């Protein structure tokens, strides 16, 4: 049996402010730092170890991973960064307060932008200061490949591509893998692994910085999955609450 650990970054400053974040490089909040330390302690207490780690090029996921590995005394573990593990790009919504956006466009429209599979939010324009195609972290991306907005389907496509090209070979070679990423990125991977329908993924929420364990067979098909707490495996359907850490 193969185990894969997925973890969404700890609470970010814009999570705290209830703003659309997307590809904006926002750091962790004080609470998010605590959540990351807690996650590392949970994994260590439950006897987990890792040979390789994967994350995005956004600091909230990177820092979460650093803290988790530090708490586990695994700072030597190789880390691979890729924009393909970035959060979904929220286009022109990035930086906007979610409640204020709902007042402007209506709750239903914002819900469609956030939760539908194939509807993209309004796109950025290339003259928008939030457009970052020239940022060095995206030097491997051609200008016409850089997204101006994304739907969940777009996100799933790049995540699954990275899964097959980079992560699957690691798992098949026997390496113990952790992925530190983002809410919609993990939703996309879970949708793919569990073969969820579009309706099934709409209500799927990934909590911040709670280790999610997938047990996979030799063909990397899911056997089962569960969240971890200080006391071990959490019963199916339950999500553990954070403790003060």
Curated annotation (Swiss-Prot):
One of its GO terms (biological process) is glycolytic process. The keyword Isomerase applies. Gene3D superfamilies: Phosphoglycerate mutase-like. Keywords: Gluconeogenesis, Glycolysis, Isomerase. It catalyses: (2R)-2-phosphoglycerate = (2R)-3-phosphoglycerate. Pfam families: His_Phos_1 (PF00300). Its EC number is 5.4.2.11. Substrate binds at residues 8-15, 21-22, 60, 87-90, 98, 114-115, 183-184. Pathway: Carbohydrate degradation; glycolysis; pyruvate from D-glyceraldehyde 3-phosphate: step 3/5. The active site is at 9 (tele-phosphohistidine intermediate), 87 (proton donor/acceptor). GO terms for molecular function: phosphoglycerate mutase activity. The record marks 182 as: Transition state stabilizer. CDD domains: HP_PGM_like. InterPro entries: His_Pase_superF_clade-1, His_PPase_superfam, PG/BPGM_mutase_AS, Phosphogly_mut1. Catalyzes the interconversion of 2-phosphoglycerate and 3-phosphoglycerate. Belongs to the phosphoglycerate mutase family. BPG-dependent PGAM subfamily. This is 2,3-bisphosphoglycerate-dependent phosphoglycerate mutase. It comes from Bacillus mycoides (strain KBAB4) (Bacillus weihenstephanensis).
């Amino acid at each position: 049996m193969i185990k894969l650990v997925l973890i969404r970054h700890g609470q970010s400053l814009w999570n705290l402010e209830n703003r659309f974040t997307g590809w904006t490089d926002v750091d962790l909040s004080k609470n998010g730092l605590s959540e990351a330390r807690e996650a590392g302690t949970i994994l260590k207490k439950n006897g987990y170890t890792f040979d390789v780690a994967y994350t995005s090029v956004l600091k909230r996921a990177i820092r979460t991973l650093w803290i988790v590995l530090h708490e586990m005394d695994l700072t030597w573990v190789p880390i691979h960064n890729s924009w393909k593990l970035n959060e979904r790009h929220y286009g022109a919504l990035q930086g906007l307060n979610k409640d204020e956006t709902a007042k402007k466009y209506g709750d239903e429209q914002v819900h469609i932008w956030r939760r539908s599979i194939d509807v993209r939010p309004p796109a950025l324009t290339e003259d928008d200061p939030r457009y970052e195609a020239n940022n060095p972290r995206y030097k491997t991306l051609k200008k016409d490949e850089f997204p101006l907005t994304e739907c969940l389907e777009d996100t799933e496509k790049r995540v699954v591509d990275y899964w097959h090209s980079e992560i699957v070979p690691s798992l098949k070679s026997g390496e113990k893998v952790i992925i530190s990423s983002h809410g919609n990125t993990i939703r996309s991977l879970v949708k793919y692994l569990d073969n969820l329908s579009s309706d099934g993924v709409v209500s799927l929420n990934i909590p911040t910085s709670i280790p999610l364990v997938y047990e996979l067979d030799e063909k990397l098909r899911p056997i089962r999955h569960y969240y971890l707490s200080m006391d071990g495996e959490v019963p199916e359907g339950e999500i553990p609450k954070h403790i003060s850490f």
